[in-house]
């Protein structure tokens, strides 16, 4: 059985967990979990930043800061048991079922075959099975797109049209939203009779969120469907499994949610449907169990890695202990072959959160300046860290040692050195932004809204995150992928802006409670002379407009593999679950806690 390598600064000899080489292509398992999207979580600490001398010694112990509790998960996952014989059995069953599902793509005949294939694709995506059939799906979508006119001619079923639209947009085909004009009456509005089709209304609602900046009809569709769905969710006037699905969609849409979380819910919905295919249902349940065990293996290793960093003895208790939450966010990258991506991202997110909490919650301004200079020099030698307080030496060493592990992992790969340098540069950029925010925070300075986003959008670390994804990916042209990333700056800037705004919107009350005034809401209020309520409304609209612009960017021709583009999209999904109506990452509550239980506990 081929092993998945695990690397780590303190793990000594290389550990291994086995990969299942037939059903799930092997990859080298890196060692770190990806948590939530750490950004400027400035909410929960009293900023103390101006008077402490650089080498302050015992004075560090006198600083005032709000300590967040340790992870409530403790060592639970460090000692989790994964039955490898059970995984072997699951693998064999999965391999036996895959050809049967693959044959379904070829079994449909006649003009209706294209529609049936698109419905099958929607089902596979919803059940978390699409990564098993990437080639078949790509070929099928491409073939269907060439017969679009014939396929849609005379099709007046709302559910069918909405699903077809959803699949094409999901796979990067810019099908025109004009196909929904057929559902409008003479008055130019959507027909009220459509409201009797609950599944159709739900599918139109989902399709409406795939819109771009010029898909005005989808704005109308969103307005039309929302009130009906809210009524159905409140009154429960359709089948219970559909009511549950509607409520989930109103909370967090499928195309904005993490695939594995969608799959677990969709299986519950699908098994109660009259047209449920027993083979596909069985496949999806086996696949879900296998993935959960696979992820649990990763989390177990990452928990060990995290414990061995010994932050508890090296740092004051100002940082968030969130290794489980970090790994959960990496599950946005569902494919088992992306173990290395998930592990590297978890380590990068750990770097981000330690840096963020150090600069935002504890360090003096002089210390932040000194740490920034140390990271800018990128000198691993101890003499380069002289003058830093001991706790900052530990922070710097942790970052440098982690990147040394990255270097050992990727240096022999094609493009590995290039991708490593690019990731280091993004780490430096994030640190510079942390320094600028610290300077503003000390004086309570409110820059212009645009200037704030330029700085804070980098600090939220989307660029650093995407660079980490590319660093962890194998069998891609990394130089080409990074150049695409730089060229498509509009896309990544929009992602950064969304992450920044969402972070600030949900963290505003905590920011203000502790006197941290430099945030997007206050900067917008100052620049445009509006009220707090108006600023909130405008920033929420900016988030929605940003989603449209990103949808638009994803539909443009690309010169990189689909897997790279999808990974960027999955990063957005990770952001969404971490800020699902609240900042559940900092406060350890709400949906994020439920997601963890669903993935790692309820096996």
From Swiss-Prot:
Subcellular location: Cytoplasm
Keyword terms: Cytoplasm, Lyase, Magnesium, Manganese, Metal-binding
Pfam annotation, one family: Terpene_synth_C
Pathway terms, separated by semicolons: Secondary metabolite biosynthesis; terpenoid biosynthesis
Needed cofactors: Mg(2+); Mn(2+)
Gene Ontology MF annotations: magnesium ion binding; terpene synthase activity
EC number(s) recorded for this UniProt protein: 4.2.3.-
Binding site for Mg(2+) 2: 356, 360
InterPro entries membership: Isoprenoid_synthase_dom_sf, Terpene_cyclase-like_1_C, Terpene_cyclase_plant_C1, Terpene_synth_N, Terpene_synth_N_sf, Terpene_synthase-like, Terpene_synthase_metal-bd, Terpenoid_cyclase/PrenylTrfase
Co-factor note (free text): Binds 3 Mg(2+) or Mn(2+) ions per subunit.
GO biological process terms, semicolon-separated: diterpenoid biosynthetic process
Free-text comment on this protein's domains from its UniProt entry: The Asp-Asp-Xaa-Xaa-Asp/Glu (DDXXD/E) motif is important for the catalytic activity, presumably through binding to Mg(2+).
Protein name, per record: Terpenoid synthase 28
Origin species: Arabidopsis thaliana
